[in-house]
From Swiss-Prot:
Entry GO terms, CC: extracellular region
Stored InterPro entries: Ig_E-set (IPR014756), LY86 (IPR039945), ML_dom (IPR003172)
High-level lineage: Eukaryota, Metazoa, Chordata, Craniata, Vertebrata
SUPFAM superfamilies noted in UniProt: E set domains
Originating gene: Ly86
SMART domains (alphabetical): ML
Protein name as annotated: Lymphocyte antigen 86
């Protein structure tokens, strides 16, 4: 009888109709930061996996060395890792940016070279030019992908500056 109960529990927990990630709404929305006149809310756009992200020193005046925390379990190897950023406001593209995070001959981070199934947890600075975020609402699409263009992580974010 215990085997039947265990099988039923597994079926209920993995059934698309009972779990939020199988619905139209996708993964839950997370707040990466909310203070200093700036709010960043994101949702994973990868249908198979969610991840964690937080931003320290949340402010409309973004510092040149911004500290973040990021955690995920890899579904793909990352010999090479790339970040694409698309910034939009009022439906118009403002910025498209692509940056290599891991290259075989120049790994920039300790997680470069990690394998499928391993966990990445990064807590540290992210270098950026530093800027003042103008008042308004912005949409960000962030995509991390490996050398085979396989998605490592993907997020739709809303940035609100007041």
């Amino acid at each position: 009888m215990n085997g039947v109960a265990a099988a039923l529990l597994v079926w209920i927990l993995t059934s698309p109709s009972s779990s939020d990630h199988g619905s139209e709404n996708g993964w839950p929305k997370h707040t990466a930061c909310n203070s200093g006149g700036l709010e960043v809310v994101y949702q994973s756009c990868d249908p198979l996996q969610d991840f964690g992200l937080s931003i320290d020193q949340c402010s409309k005046q973004i510092q040149s060395n911004l500290n973040i925390r990021f955690g995920i379990i890899l579904r793909q190897d990352i010999r090479k890792l790339f970040l694409d950023i698309t910034l939009m406001a009022k439906g118009s593209s403002i910025l498209n940016y692509s940056y290599p995070l891991c290259e075989e001959d120049q790994p920039k981070f300790s997680f470069c070279g990690r394998r499928k199934g391993e966990q990445i947890y990064y807590a540290g600075p992210v270098n950026n030019p530093g800027l003042d975020v103008p008042q308004g609402e912005y949409q960000l699409l962030l995509e991390l992908y490996n050398e085979n263009r396989a998605t490592v992580a993907c997020a739709n974010a809303t940035v609100t500056s007041s």
